[in-house]
Amino acid sequence: MNEDTFNISIRKFPKMVGVSSQREIEHAVEKARSSGAIRGNEKFPASVTLDVPGLKLSVKFEGKIELE
């Protein structure tokens, strides 16, 4: 195993997930606000599941998205 390759890879993956998921959430909130589906002061439960089948890893992370 190449430690440098591994370390770079495990840093890149969460960064990509973070940036992409933030963009998706921002678009969903803007669409919901524009259509009047939400007021803009809500709190939404949110979860993300990390699956790495080759390592038999499945971890769920839970939190909330607060608009105000």
Predicted regions and their residues:
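Long, contiguous binding/interaction regions
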Residues: 12-20
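N-terminal intrinsically disordered, cationic/polar leader segments
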Residues: 2-11, 27-30, 37-68
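Compact soluble domain cores
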Residues: 20-27
